[in-house]
């Protein structure tokens, strides 16, 4: 999916100012490629990325991941020894035990171009679901950096990216282990759906407030749909624009799921309490009264589960279809 590009004049001015300096220094400061299996692979891989661009990449020796989940996925694909730079959530959210030489590129939405260029990656993995990273494309191309954009919102997206990455690393056994093996777990969870089509409300809470999410372009939303749930925001998109307790009470979903987002979950909890939970009417919801209100693990249901997709599906199936048994 290609996102609409917003204009960021300040960012563009900053990029223009640093491009000349960076281009002059790249050749002089190019570091030695780390040794690894990739040094023995010569066959290029061509594919269409999620911005619709044709990308042809040689097996990379130096990779930069502009989002932590992509750093995690690249490691799963057998590329740990070639990862030279990553966004800061690779440390704060994923605890990947990265080598001390891996460069911290800053926030996912504020990638440090100077640091990225100095790391001399021959492949950059970027998120097409992050507008600020899409906006960086002209600058990355002007710097001569090869970049591939991916959107991973559902399990099939993960399988697709893992397949491509294992082709690039040459470690196809990793796809069998972390792709096809996990797919069997996911399918077993799907098979437990009994056709009852339970209704669900999905709320994402942050320190800034709470938003209702539908089934599109979010990990938990896509997963609920895949397991046969009916997200009430799919048929009433006014909930996406303005969270309305009155409308939630009218629709009275069978299940309510909340994901707390942000480094300090207590801030998200306060926002949730203030917005919804403190209202006495909240307690009248069937899901609340019958114990079907769940706070879900941010790592599994907001960030990308990657190797834990099967675990995430199984836990959600346990909640939705407790009587279906394990496949």
Protein language model annotation of sequence segments:
Residues 2-15, 28-71, 172-203, 260, ...:
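Bacterial Sec-exported substrate-binding components of ABC uptake systems
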Residues 90-93, 212-241:
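Alpha-helical, coiled-coil/dimerization segments enriched in small aliphatic residues
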Residues 49-51, 102-113, 236-245:
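Short helix-initiation/N-cap motifs at beta->coil->alpha
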Residues 132-135, 151-164, 197-219:
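Extracytoplasmic ligand-binding site segments that recognize negatively charged/polar headgroups
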Residues 65-119, 123-129:
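A short, structured surface patch at a secondary-structure boundary
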Residues 113-126, 145, 245-258:
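Proline-aspartate-enriched helix->loop->beta-strand connector
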Residues 18-27:
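Bacterial N-terminal signal peptides
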């Amino acid at each position: 999916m290609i996102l609409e590009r917003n204009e960021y004049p300040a960012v563009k001015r900053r990029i223009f100012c640093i491009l000349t300096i960076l281009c002059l220094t790249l050749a002089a400061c190019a570091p030695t490629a780390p040794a690894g299996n990739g040094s023995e692979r010569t066959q290029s891989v061509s594919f269409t990325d999620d911005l619709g661009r044709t990308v042809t990449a040689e097996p990379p020796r130096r990779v930069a991941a502009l989002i932590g989940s992509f750093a995690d996925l690249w490691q799963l694909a057998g590329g740990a020894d070639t990862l030279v730079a990553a966004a800061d959530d690779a440390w704060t959210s994923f605890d990947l035990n990265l080598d001390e030489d891996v460069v911290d590129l800053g926030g996912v939405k504020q990638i440090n171009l100077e640091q990225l260029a100095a790391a001399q990656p021959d492949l950059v993995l970027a998120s097409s679901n992050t507008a600020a990273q899409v906006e960086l494309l002209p600058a990355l191309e002007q710097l001569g950096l090869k970049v591939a954009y991916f959107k991973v919102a559902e399990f099939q997206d993960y399988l697709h990216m893992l397949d491509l990455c294992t082709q690039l690393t040459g470690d196809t056994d990793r796809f069998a282990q972390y792709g096809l093996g996990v797919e069997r777990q996911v399918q077993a969870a799907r098979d437990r759906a009994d056709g009852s089509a339970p209704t669900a409300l999905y709320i994402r809470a942050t320190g800034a407030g709470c938003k209702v999410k539908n089934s599109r372009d979010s990990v938990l939303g896509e997963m609920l749909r895949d397991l046969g749930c009916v997200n009430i925001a799919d048929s009433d998109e006014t909930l996406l624009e303005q969270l309305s307790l009155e409308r939630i009470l009218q629709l009275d979903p069978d299940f309510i799921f909340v994901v707390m987002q942000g480094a300090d979950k207590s801030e998200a909890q306060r926002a949730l309490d203030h917005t919804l939970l403190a209202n006495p009417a909240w307690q009248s919801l069937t899901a609340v009264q019958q114990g079907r209100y769940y706070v879900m693990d941010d790592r599994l249901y907001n960030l990308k589960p990657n190797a834990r997709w099967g675990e995430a599906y199984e836990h959600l199936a346990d909640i939705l279809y407790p009587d279906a048994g394990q496949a």
